[in-house]
């Protein structure tokens, strides 16, 4: 007698793009799904610098716009906020394509929702290895490689 596996629960990724210039919603969703926990419900929001700064100040006590913020509400639910102006500026400064930098930060944010962090050096190395592995699957190069 063969045993049946439980069907894999589908993840739900909603995308809200309040800023032009960001990658298409389908691409953002695909990058998030690559790092998603089965059955998760996540909203990706692309915002401007003023909103990112306000959220960073309110939730992290840091008075500047940052590239990505992750908000986990439960093991299966969360929001990721991506600041387009900061991401675009960083991509230019690092000589990366905008799409590659967005892919990295979406995967990075999704890993935070899964409980990963980079406060300690060992945790940061583990998280970076996981990001590199997931991005490689997506056809995106190592975001930490120095060229």
Language-model features, listed with the residues they occupy:
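An acidic/histidine-cluster motif and surrounding catalytic segment
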Residues: 1-103, 111-147
């Amino acid at each position: 007698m063969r045993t049946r596996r439980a069907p894999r629960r589908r993840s739900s990724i909603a995308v809200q793009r309040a800023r032009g210039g960001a990658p298409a919603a389908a691409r953002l969703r695909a990058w998030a799904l690559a790092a998603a926990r089965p059955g998760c419900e996540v909203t990706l929001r692309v915002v401007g610098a003023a909103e990112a700064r306000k959220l960073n100040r309110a939730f992290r006590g840091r008075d500047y716009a940052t590239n990505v913020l992750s908000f986990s509400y439960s093991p299966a639910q969360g929001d990721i906020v991506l600041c387009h102006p900061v991401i675009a500026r960083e991509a230019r400064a690092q000589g990366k394509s905008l799409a590659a930098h967005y892919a990295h930060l979406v995967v990075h944010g999704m890993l935070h929702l899964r409980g990963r962090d980079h406060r300690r050096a060992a945790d940061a190395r583990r998280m970076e290895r996981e990001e590199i592995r997931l991005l490689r699957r997506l056809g995106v190069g190592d975001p930490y490689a120095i060229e």
